[in-house]
Amino acid sequence: NQVFVELIRQGYDTENTLFYYRSRNDKEVDFVTRKGVKVEKLIQVCYDLTSEKTRLREIDALIEVAGELKCQTLQIISYQHKETIEEKGFTIQVIPFMEWVNKPILVTPEIH
């Protein structure tokens, strides 16, 4: 999965900072990123959001897991679709993959 590879390239690792998550009600989120003990963001990957069934599945999973993990940064990485979704007090950014992958990475400088 290209999103997984990009997250690894950005410095996340599967031992400490990058996870898959399943909610208490079996809703799945593709990627949970962490900084220290704090959940940083939730990411769903969905090629096409035009099907209402798919759209609801992706949004419902993000919102449920956001509530469980107390996270406010929610993203859906899509093939081409871009929009901002406001749902149940949460804001979800839908970002085309090529736009997401080309965003600059903010690197915290090392202190010596």
What are these regions (language model features)?
Residues 1-112:
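A cross-kingdom feature that marks ATP-driven nucleic-acid transaction machinery
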